A protein has these predicted regions:
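N-terminal targeting/anchoring "stem" of glycan-biosynthesis enzymes
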Residues: 9, 27, 200, 206, ...
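N-terminal membrane-anchoring alpha-helices
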Residues: 1-24
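Soluble catalytic domains of membrane acyltransferases
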Residues: 4, 21-202, 208
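C-terminal/domain-terminus segments
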Residues: 206-228
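Short, amphipathic alpha-helical "lid/cap" segments that border enzyme active or binding sites
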Residues: 8-15, 99, 197, 214-222
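Amphipathic alpha-helical segments that form well-ordered structural scaffolds
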Residues: 13, 17, 53, 141, ...
Length: 234
């Protein structure tokens, strides 16, 4: 993973000045970010800009979980692979190769980044709606690998909306799911707040039935994130 981390950091150094110029980004609660140790970073997902916004404010290398179809997008697929991106099917299924990649992240005490909503919020295409239902894969990673979760949220202060630059037919030829081909609009951030909360201890969720604990942990993370969205900062 050292090569991927170096590629990630080089890309971050290249992109950061342009992103910082285009978007007014303010981060709060960064004192909650542990400087070392394995961790799962979760956030809401309302724009294709989200991983870049979070990476801009997060000081450590993030191994991002991404929908497997994004690894078929020209240019992006190569950058994602070089930077250590980990593909996952939109139905939540994950290949053995990807599971091994996740385990390697935790073995080296790294950070796994994942959006519990998947692409569902963007598919819904209502940018004023609350977060959609969470997929519980991130909770399974936490419990099975005994890893704490760091909740975060991206709160748009100013944004605009534009048509998806890739036509629907082209997206279909690229192998994207129909619901992704049907997305009409995307959010373009102008000013955002990124808020990090205290990490959530995985240990209370190790005892008892896994299925019950997945829901409990997922619900706890959602509540924490909703509270962060309502946090007033000055």
């Amino acid at each position: 993973m050292e090569k991927e981390a170096q590629t990630y950091l080089r890309l971050k150094q290249f992109v950061a000045p342009f992103l910082g110029f285009a978007v007014n980004i303010n981060a709060y609660g960064t004192e909650h970010i542990a400087q070392e140790g394995k961790l799962i970073l979760v956030s809401n997902h309302r724009s294709d800009m989200d991983p870049f916004i979070l990476s801009y404010t997060f000081p450590r290398y993030i191994s991002w979980i991404a929908a497997d179809y994004t690894f078929r997008i020209p240019i992006f697929k190569d950058l994602a692979k070089l930077a250590g991106g980990i593909p996952m099917a939109i139905d939540g299924k994950i290949s053995m190769a990807s599971i091994k990649m996740v385990q390697q992240v935790f073995k080296r005490e790294g950070v796994l980044g994942i959006f519990p909503e998947g692409h569902d919020y963007m598919v819904q295409n209502d940018f004023f709606a609350p977060m959609v239902r969470f997929h519980e894969g991130f909770a399974a990673f936490s419990i099975r690998n005994k890893v704490d979760i760091l909740p975060s949220v991206i709160v748009p202060i100013e944004e605009s909306y534009s048509d998806i630059p890739i036509p629907s037919l082209v997206r279909s030829f690229m192998g994207m799911p129909q619901e992704v081909c049907d997305i009409k609009r995307r959010s373009i951030y102008k000013k955002v707040r990124v808020l990090y909360g205290p990490k959530i201890d995985h240990r209370p969720y190790l005892e008892g039935k896994l299925e019950d604990n997945l829901k409990k942990l997922s619900d706890e993370v959602r509540v924490r994130m909703e509270n962060l969205q309502r946090t007033q900062v000055v």
